[in-house]
Amino acid sequence: MAINAQEISALIKKQIENFQPNFDVTETGIVTYIGDGIARARGLDNAMSGELLEFENGAYGMAQNLESNDVGIIILGDFSAIREGDVVKRTGKIMEVPVGEALIGRVVNPLGQPVDGLGDIETTGFRPVETPAPGVMQRKSVSEPLQTGLKAIDALVPIGRGQRELIIGDRQTGKTSVAIDAILNQKGQDMICIYVAIGQKESTVRTQVETLRRYGALDYTIVVTASASQPSPLLFIAPYAGVAMAEEFMYQGKHVLIVYDDLSKQAVAYRELSLLLRRPPGREAYPGDVFYLHSRLLERSAKVSDDLGGGSITALPFIETQAGDISAYIATNVISITDGQIFLQENLFNSGIRPAIDAGSSVSRVGGSAQIKAMKKVAGTLRLDLASYRELEAFTQFGSDLDAATQAKLNRGRRTVEILKQPLHKPLPVEKQVVILYALTHGFLDDVPVDDILAFEEALYDYFDVHYNDLFETIRTTKDLPEEAALDAAIKAFKEYSNFKS
């Protein structure tokens, strides 16, 4: 049999063309140190900052320190099974979290894994946890209001969609309650809410989830939790995971409210990681880039331009102060990044003024342009009236002889303080807020005893719901006050019908 050299040559060439190598080339390193959620590995010379690394037991870590001899890695999750000498390999990817509609109504950890026992989450999309914030030309001015349902906020420190409004105060002053009420008030407002619990007790998170479920708010809310018992890398990454989930909706043209409860604990977790990674400590032992930690997070909240869909992320970051000290390092950092702050005071909270908002220290730098016309008209002088009342109240403690004008200011001030009180988990629609504040600023409450103010308010809403619902409807649809004569007549009719008189 003759051997045809050309046939053999063609056969070999075909085999070479069809050859599929079935081996995988990855850069690997060896773990040289493990402990406290931190690992060090040698041999990963080409690792990128923030790259996802995989340990041989299936655990993942993130490259943080790229040094000449080794790489400092923070471990995302349980690190008890990792040992010195284990192999760690590069993945070539940065950390991503699952995003999309399937997450709504679920409780997940910062890696996007469900922790509520309701089964797997079928998501198709992923977003990196670290992405650049929208640029200057990709943004739009804040112009739409975000109604929190709390009179003290919507009237005095209004928040707009796309704003960052810091909520700051000591522990146990009602910070979480303000945020939960704001989430409850988004029902039917076409908003998606994300509640990021950082370093909270698991029992506390469970309570908040049950509150959201009871009021039907879990239908439009995602809860991201990194509890106090979890390793500090998860506490550090949780807010970034939350805002990555929010960005998916924002770039679809939707509006998102995200609550970070609270960033003080994230800063503490980051300080812990930085010290373990041997980074040089600065003021209060925080690393030098702790400002950047929060600025790159909060800058991702924005109202984006119409070209990008016109969506928004509104952020309510929390900072916990010690003994009301708002000049502490982390507090001043976040105040300078955000568009205003709501300061909750312990002495107001303990004296029964809840929400315990200090109108003097609280400010909204951009929310005023988003406030509806009706609210602007009725709440315009409210802050000044409240400030002058506080001043007069302190002054009149030293003497009892007061002229009629001063006495009238004090009486109005006491009623203002009462009106701004609100029961827990009972946010008010904006039209009801406008009517009661109109009644207050136009003197209709001046002859109502202070102790009866809250009962008067409830009765007024019920009366208007039955007899003057068209006035509520006018405010709701036009965003402006109805005819003042009609509003005056309605309130007078209610006062004649009721018996709230001093």
Swiss-Prot record:
Gene3D superfamilies: 2.40.30.20, ATP synthase alpha/beta chain, C-terminal domain (1.20.150.20), P-loop containing nucleotide triphosphate hydrolases (3.40.50.300). It is an enzyme of class 7 (translocase). It is found in: Cell membrane. One of its GO terms (molecular function) is ATP binding. Its EC number is 7.1.2.2. Coiled coil: none annotated. GO terms for cellular component: plasma membrane; proton-transporting ATP synthase complex. The record marks S362 as: Required for activity. It is a peripheral membrane protein. HAMAP family: ATP_synth_alpha_bact. F-type ATPases have 2 components, CF(1) - the catalytic core - and CF(0) - the membrane proton channel. CF(1) has five subunits: alpha(3), beta(3), gamma(1), delta(1), epsilon(1). CF(0) has three main subunits: a(1), b(2) and c(9-12). The alpha and beta chains form an alternating ring which encloses part of the gamma chain. CF(1) is attached to CF(0) by a central stalk formed by the gamma and epsilon chains, while a peripheral stalk is formed by the delta and b chains. Belongs to the ATPase alpha/beta chains family. This is ATP synthase subunit alpha. It comes from Streptococcus pyogenes serotype M18 (strain MGAS8232). The lineage of its organism: Bacteria, Bacillati, Bacillota, Bacilli, Lactobacillales.
